[in-house]
């Protein structure tokens, strides 16, 4: 048999050319035990804390406990298909999510995978979920209003861009409704406002019923607010690690806007459930429990999340991320562990009370206990001019109302105070899904503090408000425009507003 050397070398060259260069070298470990969403893995000696690892079948996990003889991994998904002895691979990547404008209008899970059936998300950028918050130098103090469209909040407990304002209350007191109204209120700016004013919204649902999240998305869609919103959902049926991760994932998505000179608003609904899922993970990882069986670093869990909401300085693009975390209390107990923690981290809180809710005062904001630590620097001058007196009058009203229950013969001044207070309380009521523009709120509150409601029966206050706003939109749009552009009530505007109120009050009675 005749063997030609040239032929052999050609065959060898061909073989070498087609030799697979994509041999994959990865560090692997073995599952020692698995259960309750936690896997103990032997090996993975060089794994990093917070690194993503991969189980057979493409299930992902995150290395949290790095011990001398094994690694504690939390599993993002079902642990049913993972068995003892399975091989676990390092991915080399810290947990990250897709970010960018491509996510707007979509519903994603805590890892950024779409769950709304609208096809894949073609995001080109990814960001780590757990990054350090901006330091002191890149920040700027909060000075621009973040309008929620709710009179009770924008007038008395103003929220600024870059602030963290806690929404706290028992179940069924309208906490999510406040977030929803704040989202819907951004529609007017998105439709015809300047680019620099637009506020992109991120809603993080933690441990809620799927039906509740679906309802939230439906309302946003019907009212045209989904196009500038991102929904991150880790529902009650998702494993605890997903519920723990969702707020961080949503925050990373919001930070993209903050770091690119845009503005974002993120609502965490709610952080009590995130703390519960973190407690579950920590106890299963055998970390020592502390107060109420929460781990020692549950304060750090929330502080490092909420510190990422910030107003950046001009060198950094002047973007902002505003956070509205929600905490659900049990039986109005705000002195429990998680509520006190989050109250101490945030820049103020909006207290919602069951009693007020059932009295028909909605939004059920307790004006006495709620504060905003940013205060009037997050209001336009026009709002400061009218809302300055309303807070004092309401405080006096609450004090007097307590005394007035005992005495029947009240002097005229007290009677006047009680009358005014009852009407102002009525004025701050607002139906859901009907946020008001700032200039409309200013006009309405102006009527309240200048005595135009004092002669009306309390039941007619709402009707007067609706009528007056319709009148202003048709007849006095120049007044509203003046308040919007000047951001203050000049003497000229004040005269016109008073004249408009006088003429409307005559026709109303």
Curated annotation (Swiss-Prot):
First-tier enzyme category under EC: translocase
Gene3D superfamilies for this protein: 2.40.30.20, ATP synthase alpha/beta chain, C-terminal domain, P-loop containing nucleotide triphosphate hydrolases
E.C. designation(s): 7.1.2.2
Positions contributing to ATP binding: 169-176
Recorded superkingdom: Bacteria
Record InterPro entries: ATP_synth_asu-like_sf, ATP_synth_asu_C, ATP_synth_asu_C_sf, ATP_synth_F1_a_nt-bd_dom, ATP_synth_F1_asu, ATPase_a/bsu_AS, ATPase_F1/V1/A1_a/bsu_N, ATPase_F1/V1/A1_a/bsu_N_sf
Subcellular location: Cell inner membrane
PROSITE patterns the UniProt entry points to: ATPASE_ALPHA_BETA (PS00152)
Site (Required for activity) residue list: 370
Entry-linked CDD domains: ATP-synt_F1_alpha_C, ATP-synt_F1_alpha_N, F1-ATPase_alpha_CD
Transport as UniProt keyword: yes
Main location: membrane
GO molecular function: ADP binding; ATP binding; proton-transporting ATP synthase activity, rotational mechanism
Keywords, in A-Z order: ATP synthesis, ATP-binding, Cell inner membrane, Cell membrane, CF(1), Hydrogen ion transport, Ion transport, Membrane, Nucleotide-binding, Translocase, Transport
Pfam families: ATP-synt_ab (PF00006), ATP-synt_ab_C (PF00306), ATP-synt_ab_N (PF02874)
GO cellular-component term (any): proton-transporting ATP synthase complex
The keyword Membrane is annotated on this UniProt entry: yes
Reaction(s) catalysed (UniProt annotation): ATP + H2O + 4 H(+)(in) = ADP + phosphate + 5 H(+)(out)
Membership in a protein family: Belongs to the ATPase alpha/beta chains family.
Binding partners and assembly: F-type ATPases have 2 components, CF(1) - the catalytic core - and CF(0) - the membrane proton channel. CF(1) has five subunits: alpha(3), beta(3), gamma(1), delta(1), epsilon(1). CF(0) has three main subunits: a(1), b(2) and c(9-12). The alpha and beta chains form an alternating ring which encloses part of the gamma chain. CF(1) is attached to CF(0) by a central stalk formed by the gamma and epsilon chains, while a peripheral stalk is formed by the delta and b chains.
Protein's recorded name: ATP synthase subunit alpha
Name of the gene this protein is made from: atpA
């Amino acid at each position: 048999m005749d063997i030609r050397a040239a032929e052999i070398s050609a065959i060898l060259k061909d073989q070498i050319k087609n030799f697979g260069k994509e041999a994959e070298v990865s560090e692997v470990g073995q599952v020692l035990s698995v259960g309750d969403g936690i896997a103990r893995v032997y090996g993975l000696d060089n794994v990093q804390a917070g690194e993503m690892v991969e189980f057979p079948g493409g299930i992902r996990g995150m290395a949290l406990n790095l011990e001398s003889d094994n690694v504690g991994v939390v599993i993002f998904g079902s642990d049913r298909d993972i068995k003892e002895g399975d091989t676990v691979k390092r991915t080399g990547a810290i947990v990250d999510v897709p970010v960018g404008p491509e996510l707007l209008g979509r519903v994603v899970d805590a890892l950024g995978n779409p769950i709304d059936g609208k096809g894949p998300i073609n995001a080109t950028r990814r960001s780590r979920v757990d990054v350090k918050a901006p330091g002191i130098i890149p920040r700027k103090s909060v000075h621009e209003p973040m309008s929620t469209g709710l009179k009770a909040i924008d007038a008395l407990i103003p929220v600024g861009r870059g602030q963290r304002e806690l929404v706290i209350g028992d179940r069924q007191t309208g906490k999510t409704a406040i977030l929803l109204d704040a989202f819907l209120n951004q529609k007017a700016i998105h439709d015809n406002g300047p680019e620099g004013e637009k506020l992109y919204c991120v809603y993080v649902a933690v441990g809620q019923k799927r039906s509740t999240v679906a309802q939230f998305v439906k309302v946003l869609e019907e009212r045209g607010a989904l196009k500038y919103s991102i929904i991150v959902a880790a529902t009650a049926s998702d494993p605890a690690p997903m519920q723990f991760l969702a707020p961080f994932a949503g925050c990373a998505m919001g930070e993209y806007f903050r770091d690119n000179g845009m503005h974002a608003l993120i609502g965490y609904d709610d952080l009590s459930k995130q703390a519960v899922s973190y407690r579950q993970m920590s106890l299963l990882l055998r970390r020592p429990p502390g107060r109420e069986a929460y781990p020692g670093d549950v304060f750090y869990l929330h502080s490092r999340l909420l510190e990422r909401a910030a107003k950046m300085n001009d060198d950094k693009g002047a973007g902002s991320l505003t956070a509205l975390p929600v905490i659900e209390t049990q039986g109005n107990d705000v002195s429990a562990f998680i509520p006190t923690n989050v109250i101490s981290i945030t820049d103020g809180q909006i207290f919602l009370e069951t009693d007020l809710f059932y009295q028909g005062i909605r939004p059920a904001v307790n004006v006495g206990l709620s504060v905003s630590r940013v205060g009037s620097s997050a209001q336009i001058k026009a709002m400061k001019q009218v809302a300055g007196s309303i807070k004092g009058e309401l405080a006096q009203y609450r004090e007097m109302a307590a005394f007035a229950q005992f005495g029947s013969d009240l002097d005229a001044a007290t009677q006047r105070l009680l009358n005014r207070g009852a009407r102002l309380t009525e004025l701050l009521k607002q139906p859901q899904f009907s946020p008001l523009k700032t200039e409309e709120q200013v006009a309405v509150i102006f009527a309240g503090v200048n005595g135009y409601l004092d002669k009306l029966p309390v039941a007619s206050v709402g009707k007067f408000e609706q009528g007056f706003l319709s009148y202003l939109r048709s007849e006095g749009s120049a007044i509203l425009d003046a308040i919007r552009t000047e951001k203050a009530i000049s003497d000229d505007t004040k005269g016109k507003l008073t004249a408009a109120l006088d003429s409307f009050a005559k026709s109303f009675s």
